[in-house]
Amino acid sequence: MAPALSTSCSSVMAFSTSNALRYHHPQISLRNSLRAPKSPSFVRLPLGKVLQSRIVIRAASSAAGNPQSDADFNPYEVLGVNPIEGFDKIKQTYGRKLKDAQRSGDEATAALLEKAYDKLMYAQLMNRKKGVTFGSFKVSKDIKYADKQPIIPWGPRFSRSSKNDMLINLAISVVFSAWIAIKRNVEYKPLQFMSFVFVYRIFEKLKSFEAPSSPIYNEEGEESGRGLRMGKRLLRSLSLVFGSILLASLAYTGFLNGIEYMGYSIPMVLYNNQELIVTASSAFMLYVIASFYR
């Protein structure tokens, strides 16, 4: 009996030990396993990124040429000018406002002014063959005659002045020519005064045709390059005026030399009226240069 009892006890202990060493499978509820974690249906971005994305989208739309924004954009309201005003007046207003905006550091206003001016320039190019669009709004002279380039790059360029300016130039030429015709003993004084008057007239004409440029300021707050531009205008004005006088003087001298070369004697009328002829011919050439060229 003893051996049998010992055997049964050992078998019971072995069965208990084997059950104790078994891994219990975790009981996972089917309901819990099918439950999905709660998550929002949209992605939330910080407010700064949202505003930045809106700005990028608007900039891309503007760069792509949004037709609705271009249709609503009025360049005349941006520049604060009247559509019937001349283009030279519009250009001066644009240059003044652009300079003020850049000086104050307002980049948004400067960009808006440049966009308005570019749109008006494009309209000018489209209407350059018409001459006048409506009212007294005329195509700018440098756009209307843009393809009429001179043979010499630094030579005079065709630029017809307004009727009022042409009358002023004609009056100046007539007055100084009449002065030397009435008073023969003044020598070349009328020519000297007339030359300085036409230097000023041509200088102002060149200034009105100068395209507005973005000013560059140095460390002291002064605009750099302004003196250089004024110097170029003054040098060109002096060159045009004194070049015309030199051409008239050479023409007179060459004419007299040609008469002598052909074996004829110089008439006394030409010989005694040298100052009058040179001054009158110079006045005519200066009138043509100041009225039709720049």
From Swiss-Prot:
It comes from the Eukaryota. The keyword Ligase does not apply. Residues 1-58 form a transit peptide. One of its GO terms (biological process) is fatty acid metabolic process. Residues 183-233, 294 are chloroplast intermembrane. InterPro entries: CPP1-like (IPR021788). Residues 74-152 are annotated as: J-like domain. GO terms for cellular component: chloroplast; chloroplast envelope; chloroplast inner membrane; chloroplast membrane; extracellular region. Interacts (via J-like domain) with ARC6 (via J domain). This is Protein CHLOROPLAST J-LIKE DOMAIN 1, chloroplastic. The gene is CJD1.
